[in-house]
Amino acid sequence: MIKINLQFFGGRGASSSGGGGGGSAKGELVLPNGSKIEFEGELKYGGKDATLTKEARKVIEAWEEKRVKNKVEYAYSVMEDGTPVGAEVRGGTGSVRSPRSYKQDGATFTHIHPRGDGMLGGTFSKADMDNFANNPAKTTRAKAKEGAYSISKTDKFDTQGFKSFVSGANSKFNSSYKAKEKSLATDYKSGKIGYDDYKKGVAKAFNTALVELHNTYSSGQKQYGYKYTLEKSEK
């Protein structure tokens, strides 16, 4: 039996991009340490999430840079003046549960999306997005090796429409990845490709599905009343 664990972090319920301009990475992303992440398509970056206050951003970014290289998820929350909402919370390799107090009205909630070499940390899972929609915190972030994903509500936020949109996007994500993984598994079992090529192909397929999901989230901003971006890392 072939099994490679490419769990979508936050998928079990993470409670609930650095740089200014946009730009994109096409086909691969080269990290500051020289390692490469391969995918099909275009990973699109945006500007800074303007919803965050200067005070909140200073505290949030310092915490994200401190924790982004950890191998398990951590969560943290601050108010608009930069005051922390309780202590950070340590999770596991695929999720982190944080207290409801983290989701206070106007708060910014952030957590870490770690993943292994050759893999994108990835955008928000359906669980992340459901928590964002159902709680009063204004902004939710996920810091990954490729940057910081950030989503904020506007005064036109459509909770139910957004949740339906996210559900459809994640169904497409799952079906797209699973179809490619099944094809690769068939090729491996038949001897058409070796195990190393199978692993590399699965990683690329997963990254590709994550890029597609990210770009889909970006496309729904105006219709459902939210701001979404991937901020480039400055370090």
How would you describe each model-predicted region?
Residues 3-8:
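Sec/Tat signal peptide C-region and signal peptidase I cleavage site
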Residues 9, 13-105, 183-185, 189-235:
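Glycine-rich short-loop/terminal segments
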Residues 31-32, 120, 151:
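Generic domain-boundary/flexible-linker signal
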Residues 67, 130-132, 154:
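Generic marker of residues within folded, mature protein domains
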Residues 78-84, 144-148, 152-157:
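Short acidic-glycine loop/turn motifs at beta-strand connectors
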Residues 83-138, 144-147:
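Short HxH-centered metal-ligating active-site micro-motif
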Residues 154-178:
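Compact, glycine/acidic-enriched structural inserts
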